[in-house]
Design a protein with these regions (language model features):
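Peripheral, non-AAA+ core regions of ATP-driven protein-machinery
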Residues: 1-156
Length: 156
């Protein structure tokens, strides 16, 4: 997330479990509730991740409230990680906007976000493929470019 021009890294947590009721429960603490529902629909339609019968809880750790499209991909990855009960790669930062067609779109200031991740010791960065052409290559962090949510879910 960018606060003015300063990057602030946030932890996105998700819990996905089978619903015991006819209508699944969905909550979002610190993230836009409607955006989370939209991202779940994109996962269902574009990546074949069937969440329609599952309860889903999304939380931004530390009580922060974040409303930036760049965290879309992080929410998607957290949801899939919980749904599949598989952890993401350790020391990984994720950013990218997700569109309705399942495409992963560029976000502003990718180089600043990556520089901050390197300073904090992250080893991997999953980001929009289109951002890679504007990034200075470095051996301090492994850059993984993706172009769709279908590509993203293959990483978990």
């Amino acid at each position: 997330m960018l606060f003015r021009s300063r990057p602030i890294l946030v932890e996105i947590q998700a819990l996905v479990c089978d619903s015991n009721f006819g209508m699944p429960r969905r909550t979002a603490a610190g993230a836009d509730y409607n955006r989370v529902n939209l991202l779940m629909a994109v996962l269902e339609k574009r990546a074949g991740i069937h969440l329609s019968g599952s309860d889903a809880y999304v939380n931004i750790a530390g009580g922060m409230k974040v409303n930036e499209p760049a965290m879309d991909l992080g929410i998607v990855m957290a949801l899939v990680s919980s749904f599949r009960n598989r952890p993401m790669m350790e020391n990984t930062i994720v950013f990218g906007e997700v569109g309705l067609a399942g495409e992963v779109r560029a976000v502003s200031q990718p180089q600043i976000r990556i520089n901050e991740a390197v300073k904090l010791g992250f080893e991997n960065c999953i980001l929009p493929q289109v951002c890679l052409k504007n990034i200075k290559k470095t051996d301090k962090i492994n850059l993984i470019g993706i172009s769709s949510v279908k590509d993203a879910v293959k990483l978990i």
